[in-house]
């Protein structure tokens, strides 16, 4: 019997490559299961993993086998029932056992579905696969505080982790050649002189000279051996310098309507949408700030806790939120240095002529500063004035203004993917 002993020092994640290959192979099954899981989960249960089941028929390997049809001549072992020339009845069915759906059977075999668990990281990978912030640009920072280490040749000083082995060995070889060359030349001359002296007639030889040459040869050989293979003088280190870089910093304004017209069901849908957005940004972008704004008749910037869990409510003036967004941009986020995004969720109900004010704010001020604006209307009913005014904004900015309607919780994830799908750079 053969035994395989794994002596790798790191015993963790040995099958990571095989697992990734498996996830890639059954990607379509997993994505369907992940989408169903996202639609049925509550807003507080979005970050855990998921158990996935794949039907046995989908994981079976393709094989070649004889089908039930066709004419065949075979030689079977002897038996007591048949003799030469007897005709055998062809088996019925499709050549398979009797297992599967339907009534019970006393024949055949079957297999349960193959089930496995996705980790939290794998689950979120599939949730946000193929999504990205639209029109994300690199902005040049005025204070140049965004730097990136870049290679800038080699240096004689540095830390061991930056040692350049190839350059160090090249320097060591050059030093050895340079130091050993004169010694080898002197050694060669001494050996030739000794050989010449020893070839002389014994009467003419100079024993003292021979002794001096042998001593000189021994001294030179020791000098050759003393030349070190590598010396601290030979060491070279990769030199890194901090180079100012453009930044892809971004800020996302999350604007949620909490007015009295928003039912608890509407608010839960809005929270689930923003939670998906929050997880997406937190997972995929290191330098994205989030600004949370709740509004009814008045808008207020709040923290994450208050945004998701506060029970404050009131009337509806949407323009108060857009005005606050414009003020915050003017105070803290220069469009020259930041990529600016807005995600708004509302039921579409607004106070009298305020929808026209919202359109004017967007057309005259906000859209010139923003990379992308998304509006989600949560209602099963027909659209109202706010949607109609926003349609005019979308017509003027078709690539940077997006609108979608959500009727039920099952629409959240598909709508989210439509709004933030990766776009081909123009």
Swiss-Prot record:
Pfam family, one: DUF444
Coiled coil: none
Ranges of Basic and acidic residues composition bias in the record: 82-93
Region annotated Disordered, chain positions: 82-109
Database matches in HAMAP family: UPF0229 (MF_01232)
Family: Belongs to the UPF0229 family.
Protein name as annotated: UPF0229 protein Csal_0882
Organism from which the protein derives: Chromohalobacter salexigens (strain ATCC BAA-138 / DSM 3043 / CIP 106854 / NCIMB 13768 / 1H11)
């Amino acid at each position: 019997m053969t035994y395989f002993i794994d002596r790798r020092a790191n015993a963790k994640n040995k099958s990571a490559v095989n697992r990734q290959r498996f996830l890639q192979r059954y990607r379509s099954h997993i994505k369907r299961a992940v989408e169903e899981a996202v639609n049925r989960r509550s807003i507080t249960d979005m970050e855990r993993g998921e158990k996935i089941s794949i039907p046995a028929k989908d994981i079976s390997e393709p094989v070649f086998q004889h089908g039930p049809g066709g004419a065949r001549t075979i030689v079977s072992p002897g038996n007591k029932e048949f003799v030469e020339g007897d005709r055998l009845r062809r088996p019925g069915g499709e050549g398979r056992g009797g297992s599967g759906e339907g009534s019970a059977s006393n024949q055949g075999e079957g297999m349960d579905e193959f089930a496995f668990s996705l980790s939290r990281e794998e689950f979120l990978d599939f949730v946000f696969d193929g999504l990205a912030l639209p029109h994300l640009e690199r902005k040049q920072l005025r204070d140049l505080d965004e730097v990136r280490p870049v290679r800038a040749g080699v240096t004689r000083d540095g830390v061991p982790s930056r040692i350049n082995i190839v350059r160090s060995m090249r320097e060591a070889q050059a030093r050895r050649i340079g130091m050993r060359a004169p010694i080898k030349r002197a050694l060669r001359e001494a050996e030739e002189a000794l050989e010449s002296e020893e070839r002389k007639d014994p009467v003419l030889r100079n024993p003292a000279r021979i002794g001096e040459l042998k001593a000189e040869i021994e001294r030179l050989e020791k000098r050759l051996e003393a030349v070190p293979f590598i010396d601290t003088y030979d060491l070279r280190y990769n030199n890194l310098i901090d180079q100012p870089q453009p930044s892809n910093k971004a800020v996302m304004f999350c604007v949620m309507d909490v007015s009295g017209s928003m039912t608890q069901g509407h608010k839960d849908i809005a929270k689930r949408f923003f939670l998906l957005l929050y997880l997406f940004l937190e997972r995929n972008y290191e330098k994205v700030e989030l600004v949370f704004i709740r509004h009814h008749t008045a808008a207020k910037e709040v923290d994450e806790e208050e945004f998701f869990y506060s029970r404050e409510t009131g009337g509806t003036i949407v323009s108060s939120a857009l005005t606050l967004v414009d003020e915050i941009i003017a105070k803290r986020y220069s469009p020259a240095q930041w990529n600016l995004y807005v995600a708004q969720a509302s039921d579409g109900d607004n106070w009298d002529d305020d929808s026209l004010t919202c359109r004017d704010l967007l057309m005259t001020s906000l859209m010139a500063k923003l990379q992308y604006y998304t509006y989600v209307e949560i209602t099963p009913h027909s659209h109202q004035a706010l949607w109609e005014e926003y349609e005019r904004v979308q017509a003027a900015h078709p690539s940077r203004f997006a609108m979608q309607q959500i009727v039920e919780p099952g629409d959240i994830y598909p709508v989210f993917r439509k709004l933030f799908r990766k776009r081909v750079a123009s």
